[in-house]
From Swiss-Prot:
Modified residues (N6-acetyllysine): K16
Encoding gene (name): HBA
Protein name stated in the entry: Hemoglobin subunit alpha
InterPro entries tied to this protein: Globin, Globin-like_sf, Globin/Proto, Hemoglobin_a-typ, Hemoglobin_oxygen_transport, Hemoglobin_pi
Modified positions (Phosphoserine) in chain numbering: S3, S35, S102, S125, S139
Residue positions where Phosphothreonine is found in the record: T108, T135, T138
Organism per entry: Procavia capensis habessinica
PANTHER family: HEMOGLOBIN FAMILY MEMBER, HEMOGLOBIN SUBUNIT ALPHA
Amino acid sequence: VLSAADKNNVKGAWEKVGTHAGEYGAEALERMFLSFPTTKTYFPHFDLTHGSAQVKAHGQKVGAALTKAVGHLDDLPNALSDLSDLHAHKLRVDPVNFKLLSHCLLVTLSRHLPEQEFTPAVHASLDKFFSNVSTVLTSKYR
């Protein structure tokens, strides 16, 4: 559960992400594909080379979903219900992959947000947020 301080930290960090959400989403995906090559199996039809249009487009989707989630911190299950259905029933993504992407998102944000703004407290709040999003996205697997 996100505390009031966590919610403020997440919203504050995401304000700084702003229009870069899709770009950072794509960078995190590339990082995930390089660091955890088994994740590529869910994208057999994608060109996974650096800067590919398909990875950029999917990064935009990731960024948009996270932006939506930030706007609905008190109701993530309803806000992400459609994505939960998609990933559980149609795409059948192994739940561990959400943890891998979450890690790559944290690394990406740590690279782009200024050090004085990506504090340990903000890092912890974003980690909790990504964990909550992952939990919601895997909730319909059960």
